[in-house]
């Protein structure tokens, strides 16, 4: 009767049939609110997904609000990647939400359709953590080795909600290259300054003692390997 709700499975109340959630903030809801607001202000923003709209909080009522600015291509991540590249090529601002474990399904399209063409696609990678899915077919721990080796792709890893939103905003407004963003699993909020421009990646490290050690390690690696290290 409700295939969308029961697509993913999980603990539920046998009487009501409703899922049992821990409650509290989620990045799904945070990104949903951000994207719906962004869509109202900018008609060129298009959210794309492959049969898992709940990962960005786009339930049926929210999809109706988004209208044509939300596209579900069905269980076909390859199509989602190719469509995102096409939308970006023609001046749109595609936001493609995908589970980490499903990145493998469309590696060719990410590499060739998106990255070779340097299409400014924003790719939100969800459940990319040991804290996410536990079953062997959905482990979210292989996205980094897969994506970091693709030329022309910038892969960002925010540590809190404010960084996630800032990185997404920056990615949508830049037109130079595709950007993937590794959405955290547990909601945290920034305790310090949040950067707005990610064209040159730098680590923001606290406390100062750890910062000194990181700079020291970075300088040693630069000398030993002969290549610059982000610090």
Name what the model sees in each region.
Residues 1-182, 187-188, 210:
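Thiamine diphosphate
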Residues 91, 176, 198-209, 216, ...:
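Long hydrophobic segments that form regular secondary structure
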Residues 187-204, 213, 221:
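Aromatic-enriched
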Residues 148, 224-225:
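Short, flexible turn/loop "capping" segments at secondary-structure junctions
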């Amino acid at each position: 009767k409700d295939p969308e709700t029961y697509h993913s499975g999980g603990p539920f109340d046998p009487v009501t049939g409703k899922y049992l959630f821990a409650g509290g903030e989620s990045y799904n809801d945070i990104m949903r609110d951000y994207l719906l607001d962004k869509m109202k202000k900018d008609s060129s923003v298009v959210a794309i997904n492959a049969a898992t709209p709940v990962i960005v909080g786009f339930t049926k009522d929210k999809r109706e609000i988004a209208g044509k600015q939300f596209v579900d291509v069905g269980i076909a991540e390859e199509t989602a990647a190719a469509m995102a590249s096409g939308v970006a090529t023609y001046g749109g601002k595609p936001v493609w939400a995908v589970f980490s474990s499903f990145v493998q399904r469309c590696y060719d399209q990410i590499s060739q359709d998106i990255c070779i063409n340097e299409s400014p696609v924003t790719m939100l990678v969800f459940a990319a953590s040991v804290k996410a899915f536990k079953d062997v077919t959905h482990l979210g721990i292989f996205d980094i080795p897969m994506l970091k080796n693709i030329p022309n792709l910038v892969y960002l890893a925010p540590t809190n909600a404010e960084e996630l939103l800032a990185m997404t905003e920056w990615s949508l407004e830049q037109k130079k290259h595709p950007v993937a963003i590794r959405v955290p699993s547990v909601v945290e909020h920034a305790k310090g300054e949040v950067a707005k421009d990610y064209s040159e990646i730098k680590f923001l490290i606290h406390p100062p003692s750890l910062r000194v050690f990181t700079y020291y390690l970075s300088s040693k690696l630069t000398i030993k390997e002969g290549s610059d290290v982000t610090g």
